[in-house]
Amino acid sequence: IVPFLLGMVPKLVCLITKKC
């Protein structure tokens, strides 16, 4: 898996769940 994608996943989860 590309490191860039690994970095994007937590950000997407943060935006969706509003838990940062």
UniProtKB/Swiss-Prot annotation:
Expressed by the skin glands. Keywords: Amphibian defense peptide, Antibiotic, Antimicrobial, Cytolysis, Disulfide bond, Fungicide, Hemolysis, Oxidation, Secreted. InterPro entries: Antimicrobial_frog_1. Its main location: secreted. Disulfide bonds join C14-C20. It is found in: Secreted. One of its GO terms (biological process) is killing of cells of another organism. It comes from the Eukaryota. The modification Methionine sulfoxide is found at M8. Transmembrane segments: none annotated. It holds the Pfam family Antimicrobial_1. GO terms for cellular component: extracellular region. Antimicrobial peptide active against Gram-positive bacterium S.epidermidis ATCC 12228 (MIC=4 uM), against Gram-negative bacterium E.coli ATCC 25922 (MIC=64 uM) and against yeast C.parapsilosis ATCC 22019 (MIC=16 uM). Has hemolytic and cytotoxic activity. Belongs to the frog skin active peptide (FSAP) family. Brevinin subfamily. This is Brevinin-1ITa. It comes from Rana italica (Italian stream frog).
